[in-house]
From Swiss-Prot:
Part of the 50S ribosomal subunit. Contacts protein L32. PANTHER family: LARGE RIBOSOMAL SUBUNIT PROTEIN BL17M, RIBOSOMAL PROTEIN L17. Coiled coil: none annotated. The lineage of its organism: Bacteria, Bacillati, Bacillota, Bacillota incertae sedis, Caldicellulosiruptorales. This is Large ribosomal subunit protein bL17. InterPro entries: Ribosomal_bL17, Ribosomal_bL17_CS, Ribosomal_bL17_sf. It comes from Caldicellulosiruptor bescii (strain ATCC BAA-1888 / DSM 6725 / KCTC 15123 / Z-1320) (Anaerocellum thermophilum). The keyword Signal does not apply. The keyword Zinc does not apply. GO terms for cellular component: cytosolic large ribosomal subunit.
Length: 113
């Protein structure tokens, strides 16, 4: 099984971070974050969209258990997933912005295609 990066956080903190980032991505459609976080988020977001494409109750409950906001999960099933019915993956895009001023970390936009 492939692992995600540790991102210098313990397991619970890292999982909460990814849940927050995924919720924000589906809520806003585009977010700015570091490159490492975006690469991990891409894997999670694409899996959630693939699950949502099934559209059944079990899939809805599975996604609802991952995302923090119920209305975001509803939008994922009603608005976002139907856009990708003819596409097999590649639902997100990462665009490099440049280094962050404070510490030089590479900042990127991750957005839904």
């Amino acid at each position: 099984m492939n692992k995600l990066r540790k991102l210098k956080r313990d397991t619970d903190h890292r999982q909460a971070l990814m849940r927050n980032l995924a919720t924000s991505l589906f809520k806003h459609g585009r977010i700015m974050t570091t490159e490492a976080k975006a690469k991990d988020l891409r894997r999670i977001a694409e899996k959630l969209i693939t699950i949502a494409k099934k559209g059944d109750l079990a899939s809805y409950r599975r996604v609802l258990g991952y995302l923090y906001e119920e209305d975001v999960a509803y939008d994922l099933f009603q608005k976002i997933a139907p856009r990708y019915q003819g596409r097999n993956g590649g639902y997100t895009r990462i665009i490099k912005v440049g280094p962050r001023k404070g510490d030089g970390a590479m900042m990127v936009y991750i957005e839904l295609v």
